[in-house]
């Protein structure tokens, strides 16, 4: 979208009574094509606040194979600075590339721990949002369980999408019980509405 297209949507959300928004369009230092400080002002002009955002940078084949994600962390440093300027409290990774091995998943857990440490240093919380495929197995381990057990709770939280958890044949309540305190945020949607 071009700069400013989101303003009527923001006003409509505020008119419905929403007080926070979660953005999902970070690219090249901009949110919805707008400098982060301006996006923050536009949101706050409606009486709302930018609480969180979805953004990610997947690891390349080389980074995944070598475990060296130094270049990716440079991108994250810029991303974190932009989100701090936008007043964001939570940065959430909405998905990751398909992983076929536990070694690859372990690399992603180390990557997320490092990004989480950088977010924490900036006063931002860092998390991961599931879909149904995180309930698939990689080498006989459920991906989400492995991620929960191999990320640092002090650096990485999880934003459970309840719909996708159920679609993955799992119970949200079972996960809340098994991993207390790991699910800081939820996404709730109605299956009847989205099919």
Regions found by a protein language model. Give the residues of each.
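Hydrophobic faces of well-ordered beta-strands that scaffold small-molecule active sites
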Residues: 1, 21-23, 50-55, 91-93, ...
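Active-site acidic/histidine proton-transfer and metal-coordination neighborhood
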Residues: 20, 61-158
């Amino acid at each position: 979208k071009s700069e400013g297209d989101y303003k009527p949507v923001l006003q409509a959300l505020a008119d419905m009574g929403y007080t926070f928004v979660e953005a999902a369009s970070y690219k090249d230092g901009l949110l919805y094509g707008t400098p982060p400080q301006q996006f923050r002002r536009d949101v706050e002009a409606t009486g709302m606040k930018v609480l969180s955002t979805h953004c990610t940078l997947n690891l390349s084949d080389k980074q995944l194979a070598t475990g060296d994600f130094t270049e990716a962390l440079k991108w994250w440093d810029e991303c974190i600075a932009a989100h701090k300027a936008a007043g964001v409290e939570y940065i959430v990774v909405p998905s990751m590339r398909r992983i076929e091995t536990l070694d690859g998943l372990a690399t992603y857990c180390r990557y997320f721990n490092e990004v989480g440490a950088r977010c924490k240093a900036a006063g931002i919380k860092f998390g991961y949002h599931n879909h149904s495929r995180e309930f698939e197995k990689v080498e006989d381990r459920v991906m989400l369980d492995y991620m929960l057990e191999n990320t640092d709770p002090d650096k990485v939280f999880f934003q459970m999408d309840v719909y996708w958890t159920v679609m993955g044949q799992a119970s949200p309540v079972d996960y809340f019980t098994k991993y207390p305190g790991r699910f800081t945020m939820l996404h709730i949607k109605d299956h009847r509405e989205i099919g």
